[in-house]
UniProtKB/Swiss-Prot annotation:
Keyword Zinc-finger recorded: no
Protein name: Large ribosomal subunit protein bL25
Top-level taxon of origin: Bacteria
HAMAP family: Ribosomal_bL25_CTC
GO terms for biological process, alphabetical: translation
Family the entry assigns: Belongs to the bacterial ribosomal protein bL25 family. CTC subfamily.
Protein role: This is one of the proteins that binds to the 5S RNA in the ribosome where it forms part of the central protuberance.
Entry keywords, A to Z: Ribonucleoprotein, Ribosomal protein, RNA-binding, rRNA-binding
Pfam families reported in the protein's UniProt record: Ribosomal_L25p, Ribosomal_TL5_C
Length: 203
């Protein structure tokens, strides 16, 4: 999985006054969990643009100076309800020998036979939770829709790779090809046309 580097500074004070001062200065207060103790730090709000405002998934390298560096993933984010300004971010520390669960986007590949026949593709799951060692986290889960005929569904059991485990029930639908109104109407008209000669035929 691709990684984004966030350069920040450890916080000496974590009270409300210092937190408000940080935000007024254009910084975001953050906490890194998962290690022996929580690490409080802050970073410029602009540093999070490529991490937060994107449909893609990333791991994060947090650099706090003096040789302190941590690998992590974004765990939780708080934004202002009106301005969408980032108020606070929680991160979770990664360790090479410990599996982690996170959401990654679904990438559709291939051309469905059902779509070519007039069906409509519906993506039921835009993201899937996967569990893997940090080195095996995928940038996305590839979903090949090529075999899907009209009315078929693609389940999570048909996507993914051995390097990671998909954390959803086997009956979870990733994508499906629905019969479009146009295709349904055409089928109905074809059925009527097929019956017409039979009705008009005299014995």
């Amino acid at each position: 999985m691709k990684s984004i580097t966030i350069k920040g500074s450890e916080r000496e004070s974590v009270g409300k006054v210092s937190t408000k001062a940080l935000r007024n200065a254009g910084a975001v207060p953050c906490v890194l969990y998962g290690g022996n103790q929580a690490v409080h730090f802050s970073a410029d709000a602009a540093a999070f643009k490529n991490l937060v405002y994107t449909p893609n998934a990333h791991t994060v390298v947090i650099e706090l100076g003096k040789g302190k560096s941590f690998n992590a993933i974004l765990q939780d984010i708080q934004v202002h309800p009106v301005t969408d300004k980032i108020l606070h971010i929680d991160f979770f520390q990664l360790f090479d020998d410990k599996e982690i669960t996170m959401e990654v986007p679904v990438k559709i590949v291939g051309t469905s036979k059902g779509v070519l026949a007039g069906g409509v593709l519906r993506l039921n799951q835009r993201k899937l939770k996967v569990k893997a060692l940090p080195a095996n986290l995928p940038d996305f889960v590839e979903a090949d829709i090529t075999p899907l005929e009209m009315g078929n569904k693609l389940y999570v059991t048909k996507v993914g790779k051995p390097e990671y485990k998909i954390m959803h029930p086997d009956n979870t639908v990733v994508a499906q090809v629905r019969i479009s109104r146009a295709a349904m109407k055409a089928a109905q008209e074809a059925a009527k046309a097929a019956k017409a000669p039979a009705k008009g035929k005299k014995k």
